[in-house]
Amino acid sequence: MAGASSRVHYLSDFCCPLGGRAAGKPFVLRHEAEVFLSTGREFVYVYDQEGGLLTAVYQFPDQVWHLQLLAIRRALYVLCARTGIYCLSLDSLDRSGSQACEDKEEAAPPYPVIHVDPDACVLPDAALCAFTVLDDMLVTLAQGPTQWKMQLFERPCAGEEPLPRGQIGEVELSTCTPPGGVPEKPAAPRFLPVLCCVFPPDSRAPHGHPQGCGCFTLEEALFGLLFGVDATLLQSPVILCGLPDGQLCCVVLKALVTSGLAPGDPKVLVKILHHLEEPVIFIGALRAEPHEEEAAGELLPGQHEHSDCLVALGHQGRTLAIKASWSESGNLVPELREYCLPGPVLCAACDRDGHVYHSTPSDLCVVDLTRRDSPWNPEKPDGAIGGLPSVLCPASLNICSALALCVTARAPTGSTELLALSSKGRLITCSLDLNSEAPVPAKMAMANAGQKIKELLLDIGDVSERVSFLKKAVDQRNKAITSLNEAMNVSCALLSHPEGDRPIACTITTSWSRLELRDMLMATCTLENSSSFSLDQGWTLCIQVLTSSSALDLDGTGSAFTYTIPVDRLGPGSRREVTLPLGPSESGVLDLPVTMSCWLFYSLREVVGAALAPSDPLEAPYLEQFPLSLPKQEGVCLPLCKRTVDMLQCLRFAGAATHPAQAPCMPGPACEPVETFLKTCQAPGSEPTGAASLRAKYLPPSTASIRVSAGLLRAALEDSHSGFHLCSATLRWLLAENAAVDVVRAQTLSSIQGIAPDGTDVNLTVHEVAVTDLSPAGPIQAVEIQVESSSLANMCRAHHAIIRRIQTMVTEQAALGSSPPDLRMQYLQQIHANHQELLREVQALRDQLCTEDELSSCSTAQKLLHIYKQLRNPSLVLL
């Protein structure tokens, strides 16, 4: 719009809520010199524009959703969330304000705060979401469980009793989705419906309503085309309703009169005019074509004229304009046009000159509906001439976004004046000169020059504030895009190397350390970045430690612990070490094996969410239409490594103790002073009486063995242990992951004695044997690995660790195509049958243990141990 200019004056500052806009809708009304304002909280402010003073503040029980002023009755109607409609008499404002000032002379605020009495609630209803008031009637819209309900009441006055008696009629509208929340206080709807009243041209005009208060008069042609013959003949006002689902419907007011027990039929009373497919934010009317008297210069300024165009705006900017136009056949038809304006729309207003003002989070714009494609022709009857513009071009007014707008009367200079509540909580007036074609230089007085400079400085500060906000938002988004690009590169680098050397790798090593007077098994995870990328914000190293169940608890399950360590600025060539204790616990127990898994996690919510979140909390409600679209897992998970820590890795050796002067200490809780004293007082040469010592002295050690083909071992160990005796090489291979393996490497050993985490001995012996009766070609050379320990649990853990290594070796050799020698199948079948018989005996003995007494169970347990020993020493060989 060429030549549009504005002058902004700041009147006062108010506090705006940080919550959603639909939960408390800001509202601004003006009548004469008084401005009635709500910021969406529980306060209604009364501001004297001429005096520049805040005269009173009304405090309601909950958030204020809507205001409407009935000036001819000197009454202000207020919709309070989850409470109902209140009616305040403006005549008592001065008296209430004076009394409040006398009672609170020493109060901090310079204005009186008037707590609204509950008796002022003239229509209590927690489901009310919108209303409009006429001279003698009150129309409400309530949200039911499944549908909207429109109700018509006799208009209540201030000081009257609540109105269950005054209902005249009701009708149900379309379906709705009720908000959530607890039953006592349900959540507020995100968008509130919009109600307004349309009067026919020959009816009693709404003189008691200020402009922009939801009541207007349409020309006869448009009124009849929209609402039908019945509304025209009845000369009935029509209630227009814009719903959050996008429906624009109407109800003829005089047809709504029904009995209290028989609501009206929606199919007859409710007419759907259009569907915007987005929440309706504003409904208004304007003059799109000049009136004949106005064109001739006979219409006086301020004289009442009827509107010829109905306008509705949706939240995302979809705009509907309806006007009566001539068809090609010469008949009057309703012309409907949809436009797309910048969104999301926060609020809107229109004047009688064909201008629509709408506010977005970044700007306040105006569009002109009088710019038609065809020129105005005064020879057409009824003033229904011409058409609507095909395209609307919004013009920026260079004003920050507004939460509420009100078009006041035209200023004496001929410019339009807007009253607005900015997103920062400032009440401002905007004098708009929308018809000036070009600025005309003129001499300026000194006083006017100072005022002009002040206005320019305010505009510069306003624009600077907007630029700062936009720059901060752009910087955050650029940072997020850079981080996402790095994350994509890291993900591709890791996923393209599923095996082998990775550009970003994590290694796990274990070692024994002295911690709090106890020997602790520590795991060190080293994250090394060998790539050309950096791990910055959003990256987390996750380490999961999964312990196995106790060997003595058959029904027990292991426990899992996950540690998360933020990775902060791990650049190329850098490494990060994390050390975690694995055990033993305070009771001295270390349940092996322990499985450790490491992975990198990239949090999309931390990086992208911070970029999409508004920098200014006051802007938060207006970005709700762009929700954070993230996957359900909220991030990217990249596995790095997995390692199992078993008994062979946890064995300690006397020659490799951390402190050479002492042998490894038995882990467990620190000895109590009394126990220490008794041990020191024990006579020299006396035997210890602990459970472990007694078990080692009187019970034979538990043993298990496994035989592996010598050829299979030579093929698997020829590269890493060539030049060593096969038994020594096998022992080195079994203990290769032990931190104290240097003890084995220092000399050629075929057997070694280690110390388990609980302090008991574990002996490993490797020797060569010849297995006969298995192959028709002759004896098979094999290596027998024997485990011996006084602790049955530790023997089982070591045996399990050996089997796990041999299984991996056999799988790798099978993939290379190695084939076993010929075997005697009858001999193998006999061994298999013997094992099946032993397993059946084990099951029978275990069932027998459940029913025997303590004395008999000892004998059964001995039989079980004997059978377990036979099972752990099979006659088979792994080939």
Curated annotation (Swiss-Prot):
Protein name, as recorded: Fanconi anemia core complex-associated protein 100
Record GO terms (molecular function): DNA binding
Matches recorded under InterPro entries: Faap100
The UniProt record lists the keyword Nucleus: yes
Record GO cellular component, one term: chromatin
Coiled-coil residues: none
Assembly description: Belongs to the multisubunit FA complex composed of FANCA, FANCB, FANCC, FANCE, FANCF, FANCG, FANCL/PHF9, FANCM, FAAP24 and FAAP100. Forms a subcomplex with FANCB and FANCL.
Superkingdom of origin organism: Eukaryota
Keywords of this entry: DNA damage, DNA repair, DNA-binding, Nucleus
GO process terms (BP): interstrand cross-link repair
Protein role: Plays a role in Fanconi anemia-associated DNA damage response network. Regulates FANCD2 monoubiquitination and the stability of the FA core complex. Induces chromosomal instability as well as hypersensitivity to DNA cross-linking agents, when repressed.
Entries under Pfam families matching the protein: FANCAA (PF15146)
Primary location recorded for the protein, binned into one broad class: nucleus
Organism of derivation: Mus musculus (Mouse)
Subcellular location: Nucleus
